[in-house]
Amino acid sequence: MKNINPTHTHAWKSLEAHKAELSNITIQDLFKQEKNRFDDYSLTFNNQILIDFSKNNINQTTLSHLRQLAQECALDSAKEAMFTGEKINRTENRAVLHTALRNRTNTPVLVDGKDVMPEVNAVLAKMKDFCQRIISGEWKGYTGKAITDVVNIGIGGSDLGPYMVTEALRPYKNHLNMHFVSNVDGTHIAETLKKVNPETTLFLVASKTFTTQETMTNAQSARDWLLKAAKDESAVAKHFAALSTNAKDVEKFGIDTNNMFEFWDWVGGRYSLWSAIGLSIALSIGFENFEALLNGAHEMDKHFLSTPIEQNIPTTLALVGLWNTNFLGAQTEAILPYDQYLHRFAAYFQQGNMESNGKYVDRDGNVIKNYQTGPIIWGEPGTNGQHAFYQLIHQGTTLIPCDFIAPAQRHNPLADHHNKLLSNFFAQTEALAFGKTKEEVEAEFVKAGKSLDDVKNIVPFKVFTGNKPTNSILVQKITPFTLGALIAMYEHKIFVQGVIFNIFSFDQWGVELGKQLANRILPELTDSEKVASHDSSTNGLINQFKAWR
């Protein structure tokens, strides 16, 4: 990948000038100027996903400059570099090949001259066999009973992705009950163990190194709990499997290495649900549905790699998002799914985006001073959010671009629930774009029989300025295929922005310092002695903790 400071490009300078030209033009104005705006600013994928980005403060000139920016930042060659196994994660000297995990064509993908696809397919075949044994009931626990509950123990990408997907695809789940434990707070594992039976529970320990502190602490507690009931070390092998590469420690734990599922250092944690880390997904929805998830992502990969920039969905979303943050001043983006099954979707891409693009040093090692990198990502399902934080989106002083996501077809046809849900989905983007003027507010009062003199003091509070940017993402139905495509779409959006920001999107050094300090502090918490080895604040907090515990 080439290292190009985006602010040094001709396109960036053109965008700065263009921003001034658009400064007095609103989204409302743009819809008046462009009669076919919906048709001209929407894209479809596979006739199953519609992306409407017309309610952004952009015109064709904006898009032209943004596409030129992508070209000047060598996006096409960066895409090629990622898909062909070049080591674009330079700080860790690794390839970035989550796309190979869902490569359904078996086209060779080379890392250091070796095709990785045979190994990828071998792990998938092993996962398929394992899933069939668990789901069919062939696999027995230590008392001869079939498995009824699966507990995935992981953290970060080993937890967020599988949990999000299993929740999103609950309509496809089988009889197995799925549980996810991540937090090192003992409450998380303790409350989970209260719900399950040691005779019929399978634990998946998801840690590449088998040394992750949070994961191994929880795994050890689960092991102790099992052995308290089984009273036989051999029971561990019947109730634990590992998603790891550390065969020595896996075996030492008591897990049969035949039930160890490998993945590779070219799979980043936040992109790992497509790998063996997705075993909990496959167990929950069945391996055929897991393959459909991979197929959807693969189709989006093909779209991203080969579709011209004008029709390229992930690239378009990335460019519009970059415009909103770097030229219109937004610092956050909200992801708002109008589907309760997608209740962890925003949290998943909070990690995906912020851990990838939350960087202040560019690929040349220079501190970034004159542009913004990754935005803050957050969100909750609609309509819950409407009764919580939409007030600020509508009438606050902070610009918050939003992605609204909704399925046209429902999984639970209850009365008119879905029409009511979708009426809110459509209404919110319309309200954010067009608002309500002072004149419209006054007209409503007059129609209700009020005099303008009586309501003049309340009118300003009921005005909505509008001009708030949104994308509407309408999915025909949330299926394994469409969910896979949606996830891959956001992954590639993040990649495109990282390329243009001139940062390394696939490392996460920012998580290391806190872990290092925690390892230093942990031994200091074992006794009652006062500490004085830190700053006064940290010393004071530790000493108060010791006094109160």
Curated annotation (Swiss-Prot):
Gene Ontology, cellular component aspect: cytosol
Coiled-coil parts of chain: none
Catalytic-site annotation from UniProt: E355 (proton donor), H387, K515
InterPro entries: G6P_Isomerase, G6P_Isomerase_C, Phosphoglucose_isomerase_CS, SIS_dom_sf, SIS_PGI_1, SIS_PGI_2
Annotated Pfam families: PGI
CDD domains to which the protein is assigned, alphabetical: SIS_PGI_1 (cd05015), SIS_PGI_2 (cd05016)
One of the GO BP terms on file: glucose 6-phosphate metabolic process
Sorted UniProt keywords: Cytoplasm, Gluconeogenesis, Glycolysis, Isomerase
Reaction(s) catalysed (UniProt annotation): alpha-D-glucose 6-phosphate = beta-D-fructose 6-phosphate
Task performed by this protein: Catalyzes the reversible isomerization of glucose-6-phosphate to fructose-6-phosphate.
Record family assignment: Belongs to the GPI family.
Classification via HAMAP family: G6P_isomerase
Protein name as it appears in the record: Glucose-6-phosphate isomerase
Organism: Haemophilus influenzae (strain ATCC 51907 / DSM 11121 / KW20 / Rd)
Gene: pgi
